[in-house]
Amino acid sequence: MKLSLIRRSLVAASAALALAGGLPATAFAQAKIPLRISTPAVPDDWHAKMWTVFKESLDKSAPGEFDVQIHLNATLFKQGTEPAAMARGNLELATISAFDIAKLAPEFSLFTAGYVIRDPQHQQQVFDGPIGQEMFKLASEKMDVTVLSTIYLGTRQLNLREVRNVRTPADLKGVKLRMPGSKEWLFLGEALGATATPLAFGEVYLALKTGTIDGQDNPLPTVRAAK
């Protein structure tokens, strides 16, 4: 699960534009508002395509008012550094992992453990309901950002460099399994019987290729897109 975040100052600016519709057009004869977007997603990943749809929709809704700049592959900011970049005013929008939010808003660690969310419908119910809205509020207050929405990453599936019959935790003994860098995910990796290895998503494919790690448990569409 990932979340789309936007700087609060930008929300205020967008609201001001929306409310000032009655002003003369000359009042807005100014440069476009930059919207720098950072995501670790690769071009073929549907999360990257999501941002393209966002850009096209915004250009259609507010033509000429925003300069949307989509930075893929964590090329603008390394995964996990986006909140600090947003706080400094160097980034407006990002898809950020729940465990990176939990570093600044510990209450959000509720959503960093495995198997908390059953499926897309359950995720939507949780985050559209009182629990999710309260967590959004806490994160916004502590990080000075506005959480726009959650993004369903997919069902996590274990995949290894070498063929191995895995039926019990004992079958993963000695396997260096890449996990997200939160203590909850690392605990899950150990509970599965593997040697949990924290690694940013953007480094996973090369690490698999070189043997730095033996496996990972991302959704298969995400893995295929990153190849």
Positions of the model-derived regions?
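N-terminal export leaders
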Residues: 5-11
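Immediate post-signal peptide segment of exported/extracytoplasmic ligand-binding proteins
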Residues: 23-39, 59-67, 141, 164-176, ...
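Extracytoplasmic "Venus flytrap"
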Residues: 36-53, 73-78, 223
